[in-house]
Swiss-Prot record:
Quaternary structure annotation from Swiss-Prot or TrEMBL: Heterodimer of SoxA and SoxX. The SoxAX complex interacts with CT1020, SoxAX-binding protein SaxB (SoxK); this interaction stimulates catalytic activity of the complex.
Organism taxonomic ancestry: Bacteria, Pseudomonadati, Chlorobiota, Chlorobiia, Chlorobiales
UniProt keyword annotation of Signal present: yes
Binding site for substrate: R243
Annotated catalytic residues: C247 (cysteine persulfide intermediate)
Effect on the protein upon substituting K125G: In strain: NCIB 8346
SUPFAM superfamilies linked to this entry: Cytochrome c (SSF46626)
Family: Belongs to the SoxA family.
Protein's name in the database: L-cysteine S-thiosulfotransferase subunit SoxA
Gene for this chain: soxA
Length: 286
């Protein structure tokens, strides 16, 4: 799976971005078809860059690209560092609130609902993420919301992810409002920011598979499949939005709050780009 990556960095990404940013000319437009075309181009970019990697394997991140790293990761997953977090998340999910209900009262299918999130709520005109839904359930039942980046929110999310493994990603974008949120997420993915003037795409498309010091830069395709993650760097489990904030800080950009509209729209776009892959969280990462 190792290979030397040679490419025209800027040109390839610019052509892809241009192809993916066409906007509907009128209201009677098939927004889902526009998005599906984006997905095809986006996934095609990575399949071309890494011809030895199957589409479904991109959910494993950098471990789909490098054989030695994958072997080490597989060994670590035999005794996953997030195992206790999943057990704690299960207990929290089933723990009664003061009113006698629980988080389990808010979610169907016994809580195996990871494949339903994120989605665009047409009544509220906003993206709803799993962590947002968890905290809204607590507040609706008279409980305080969890802190949004780590701790109990990540544990409950990890439990839900664990019992939802194998659910296929199939995020729909059917309305203009949903498409607008999708476009906001796409703009954030490609926009340069911070002291280093870097973008999400700059690292995770143009430089994906390359080494940054001792680490391999992960491909953007499949980014959202495996969260929450237990990162060795953190020494604990954390949410996708915690990772977003860390990326912003790394390039000298002020991070947005976890569960902000900006990060929810970005998660929406990134998850759409992984349509067809399967949710496989929680996971361990360096």
């Amino acid at each position: 799976m190792k290979k030397t990556i040679q490419r025209g960095l800027f040109t390839g990404a610019l052509v892809l971005l241009t192809a993916m940013t066409s906007k509907p000319a009128h209201a009677a437009v098939n927004y889902q078809a526009l998005v599906d075309a984006d997905v095809k181009k986006f996934q095609g970019y990575f399949l071309k860059e890494f011809p030895g990697v199957k589409l479904e394997d991109f959910g494993d991140g950098v471990y789909a690209l490098d054989e030695d790293s994958r072997k080490q990761w597989k060994e670590m997953e035999e005794f996953p560092p997030y195992e206790l977090d999943v057990e704690a998340g299960k207990a929290l999910f089933n723990k009664p609130f003061a009113n006698g209900k629980s988080l389990g009262s808010c979610f169907s299918n016994g809580g195996a609902v990871r494949g339903m999130y994120p989605y665009f709520d047409e009544k509220r005109k906003e993206v709803i993420t799993l962590e947002m839904a968890i905290n809204e359930c607590r507040v609706a039942n008279g409980e305080k919301p969890y802190a949004p980046k780590k701790g109990d929110i990540a544990r409950v999310s990890a439990y839900i992810a664990s019992i939802s493994r194998g659910q296929k990603i199939d995020v729909k974008v059917k309305s203009k409002a949903a498409y607008d949120a999708y476009m906001k997420g796409k703009e954030m993915f490609y926009a340069k920011r911070g002291q280093l003037n870097m973008s999400c795409s700059g690292c995770h498309m143009e430089y994906s598979g390359r080494h940054l010091r001792a680490e391999i830069i992960s491909p953007a395709l499949g980014h959202t499949t495996h969260f929450p993650v237990f990162r060795s760097k953190w020494g604990e489990i954390g949410t996708l939005h915690r990772r977003y904030a860390g990326c912003n800080e790394n390039i000298g950009a002020k991070p947005f709050p976890a569960q902000s509209k900006e990060y929810r729209d970005l998660e929406f776009f990134q998850t759409v780009m992984s349509n067809g892959l399967k949710f496989n969280g929680p996971a361990s990462r360096k």
